[in-house]
Amino acid sequence: QLDFRLEGCNTLEERAQKMANILNLNINMFLTPEQIREKIDLRNEGNHFLRVVERDNGQKSILRLFNDNEKHPSETEISTALKRFVVQSPKVAFLTGHEMRDIYKTGDRDYNQFAENQYFRYSLGNQGFDVVTLSLEDQEVPEDIDIVVIADMKTPFDEIENDRLNKYIARGGNLFILGDARRQEIMNPITEQIGVTFMPGTLIEMKEND
């Protein structure tokens, strides 16, 4: 019976050597984390398995495995990866502050799953978008931003933030605005500038068995 207990192994190297001995493997078959990073640094990918598509000019695109039943990239994700070689990816900026929904948090009210999660097939990054966050308190909307997302803000913008947003709108920038119920007073000063108003109430779709 094999003993997989690692008592007395205090370092990663000691644990690796003991596991190799248990399984009768040559430890030299394996690369250390440092040696792997000399070839490719996967720390931003959680050290997960992935495929790298590379052109002759050195341009690279990534194909990931996903946390779903299909696992492998479909034609859609493969086409998206190849498209990055020839088309500039649209860049989406999620505004921060004012208690807006957060793309880095995984709670029910936040947007990590579809905005930032690398292993969710339908996240924006895996569907051909580049995603960043942006604070209007700190800076203007950069010229390379294609879409600005205002996600359910709970406190109003100040004068500087409003001015920076208005400049973006004036140059024809795209906006995606989301507001929860009972946020009219906060959201309407923004949307009314483009002829849209959040109305009181909740829209309900009734079904036959309800």
Where does each model-flagged region fall?
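Short, surface-exposed patches at the edges or C-terminal ends of soluble domains, predominantly
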Residues: 1-210
